[in-house]
A protein has these predicted regions:
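Active-site loop-to-helix "anion-binding N-cap" substructures in soluble metabolic enzymes
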Residues: 1-400
Length: 400
């Protein structure tokens, strides 16, 4: 397993300046933060460093300002939320390097915490400009990356800084890397993956990589329709990428060669209109979908069969819903299979790792987020990891 320095490797840091990359890209509505999950994820690292007497400077991006200052995207907007979660006073600094930051460090006492301005106000952040990284690094004694969600970006504060200062993985990053290693790096077999969502095109690399890594690939959501259509099934007016039939066929062939079983639903929930609890709703065999119907969820027989598959597995990776879960009753299959996975995890027979925005929402809907072994709040980074890609922000932390 790849080795990373963690906070356990830090010596005496009293009075030292910690540059800590966190994820403060928080959802806002009417100038208020609506979800502080990401702050809570970073809290153990921030408080551990502060309690050991470090001067903690938080680096983060917020929205997409494209290298220019926008007052509505200033990290000053999230200070109240950060203070609320940490239960500490937090200073805001409207710069990320230079004299203002130097003066702030002079004022801070060991254990104090400050949030620096939105790193993306500087064009050099996304360009991974070595000069910007050097200017930021000049104010720090060591660097901690606790933002796995931004680890797929090679930016100045996610990748560049790690080469200029002693670099460590924060507690959230450490937990994420451990869980991912457990899930696909060196998993207990058999391994199952659930991949759902609307389009095959957005998860093409994920599917291609997973068939070489897992024993069972369970495909749901609109993606399943594309695979069904490729096998000659009439999917009516369902969401379907008919032009990807050859691609779907190639994935079937790759799975066959790798000894991976691909599971598609054989009964489905259909309706003539996409609306909550539609009167035209019916459960049919997958070969009985009418031309004017659309598939909106997988059926109960398929869910039962998939539950039996999970009972034979030791590891599960989940990304994406099985149906149009935001609209009742098309959440039924997703919720049922999540609850099965949660029960198996509680019993100790399954290691379950899930990630991606829709997936987290589905887990919350099922009331099972706390029962999975690990739930990643990272979107793009989790997907790129599932694609087998090297993540620059993680690679930069490796001990070579």
């Amino acid at each position: 397993m790849t080795k990373f320095r963690t906070l356990d490797d830090l010596g005496d840091i009293a009075g030292k300046v910690a540059l800590v990359r966190v994820d403060l890209n928080l959802p806002m509505q009417d100038l208020s933060v609506t979800d502080n999950t990401r702050v809570r994820a970073a809290m153990p690292t921030i408080l551990e460093l502060a309690d050991k007497g470090a001067k903690v400077l938080l680096l983060a991006h917020f929205g997409r300002p494209k290298g220019a200052r926008h007052s509505e995207l200033s990290l000053s907007m999230v200070i109240d939320a950060v203070e609320h979660v940490l239960g500490r006073e937090v200073m805001f600094v409207p710069e990320i390097f230079g004299p203002v930051v130097e003066q702030t460090i002079g004022i801070l006492r060991g254990g104090d915490i400050a949030v620096l301005e939105n790193t993306r106000f500087w064009p050099g952040e996304e360009a991974n400009d070595p000069e910007l990284a050097k200017a930021i690094a000049a104010n720090g004694d060591f660097y901690v990356n606790d933002a796995f969600s931004a680890a797929h970006r090679a930016h100045a504060t996610t990748e560049g800084l790690a080469h200029l200062l002693p670099a460590y993985a924060g507690r959230a990053m450490q937990a994420e890397l451990k869980a991912l290693e457990q899930a696909l790096g060196q998993p207990e077999k058999p391994v199952a993956a659930v991949v759902g969502g609307a389009k095959v095109s957005s998860k093409l690399d994920v599917l291609t990589h997973l068939v070489t890594k897992v024993d069972h690939l369970i495909i749901g959501g609109g993606m399943a329709n594309t695979f069904l259509a490729a096998r000659g099934v009439n999917v009516g007016k369902s969401l379907c990428e008919h032009d990807l039939a050859a691609t779907a066929e190639a994935i079937f062939e790759a799975a066959d060669k790798a000894g991976c079983t691909v599971h598609l639903p054989y009964d489905v929930v259909v309706s003539k209109e996409f609306a909550p609890n539609p009167p035209s709703l019916r459960i049919v065999n997958v070969h009985e979908v009418a031309d004017d119907e659309m598939i909106l969820d997988i059926g109960p027989a398929a869910v039962e069969a998939l539950a039996d598959v999970l009972k034979t597995c030791r590891t599960l990776v989940w990304n994406g819903p099985l149906g149009a879960f935001e609209t009742p009753p098309f959440e039924v299959a997703t919720v049922a299979l999540i609850r099965t996975a949660a029960a198996l995890t509680r019993e100790g027979s399954l290691v379950s790792v899930a990630g991606g925005g829709d997936t987290v929402a589905a887990l919350n809907l099922a009331g099972a987020a706390d029962d999975f072994t690990y739930v990643s709040t990272a979107g793009g980074a989790f997907l790129e990891w599932m694609e087998g890609k090297e993540l620059p922000g993680v690679k930069a932390l490796e001990i070579t």
